[in-house]
A protein has these predicted regions:
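Post-signal-peptide N-terminal segment of Sec-exported extracytoplasmic proteins
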Residues: 43-54
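Alpha-helical segment that forms one wall of the substrate-binding/catalytic cleft
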Residues: 57-119, 128-136
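A short, acidic/glycine-rich surface segment
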Residues: 39-42, 96-97
Length: 136
């Protein structure tokens, strides 16, 4: 009986800690598939979201402020630049210091979908489920 409790506790801790660590290079293709079916020329959200990652001007503004770069909204149509923009955005907002825990794939997807605090918003859960399905 004494061994059952520690083994049960170990199983519980492992089950609770199965969230996958953030790997932006693996996450971006899944985001792209969900956002636009990998269409680099896509325009969505009534003309406000551009490219395969459906990047808004607000994201461009944040990235330029963070890095001092001069991305234009039209750069979102360039797949290489779109990836750079996404990586910069997530590397700034999806950090252990900011979130209070090690960033996960879920955090990254939900921040991409819902903004800097998207990881807390119920409205981003269904988006995460779509991204998670693409990651499998």
């Amino acid at each position: 009986m004494n061994k059952i409790i520690p083994i049960s506790l170990l199983f519980l801790l492992t089950a609770c800690n199965n969230a996958e660590s953030l790997d932006v290079n693996r996450l971006i293709p899944a985001l792209s598939k969900v956002e636009s079916n990998n269409n680099s020329l896509a325009t969505g959200d009534n003309g406000r979201a551009f490219g395969k990652l459906q990047i808004w001007q607000l994201v461009i503004d944040d990235v330029n402020k963070i890095t001092g770069s001069k991305y234009k909204h039209s750069d979102a149509f360039n797949p290489v630049k779109a990836n750079e923009i996404c990586k910069i955005y997530l590397s700034y907002y999806c950090t252990e210091k900011r979130l209070g825990h090690k960033p996960t794939m879920e955090d990254g997807a939900r921040i991409w979908n819902g903004g800097p605090n998207g990881y807390k918003k119920d409205s981003t859960i269904s988006y995460w489920n779509k991204v998670k399905a693409e990651l499998k």
